[in-house]
Amino acid sequence: MMYSVDTTNQFEKSLKECKRQGKRIEDLWEVVAILMEDGCLPDEFKPHMLTEEFAGLWECHIEDDWLLIWKQNDKRLTLLLTDTGSHESLFGRKE
């Protein structure tokens, strides 16, 4: 069974910024396709749950400093893409 995907307005805004920066947007959609099919990602993308004010959200690395944040509901098979960008743009700090 495949997961369905929805996006937030913040994700769409950040996606436009990534396009403006020349990011390979197809790389992001390849990661999303794996998530849709499997509900999880290989370790190479460093998937992990976030904590504190981001509790309940997942994060992975599309590139070293290009992240995807999403909310996942395994019972409903839904993925909500909430944001994407650098550590600094998402969390206010550089990694």
Roles of regions detected by a PLM:
Residues 1-4, 13-16, 20-23, 62-67, ...:
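Enriched for short, Lys/Arg-rich terminal
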Residues 8:
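Residue-level signal for threonine
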Residues 31, 37, 46, 75-76, ...:
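Terminal low-complexity, poorly structured segments
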Residues 31, 52-54, 69-73:
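Short alpha-helical linear motifs
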Residues 34-61:
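A short, surface-exposed loop/turn module that caps and links secondary-structure elements
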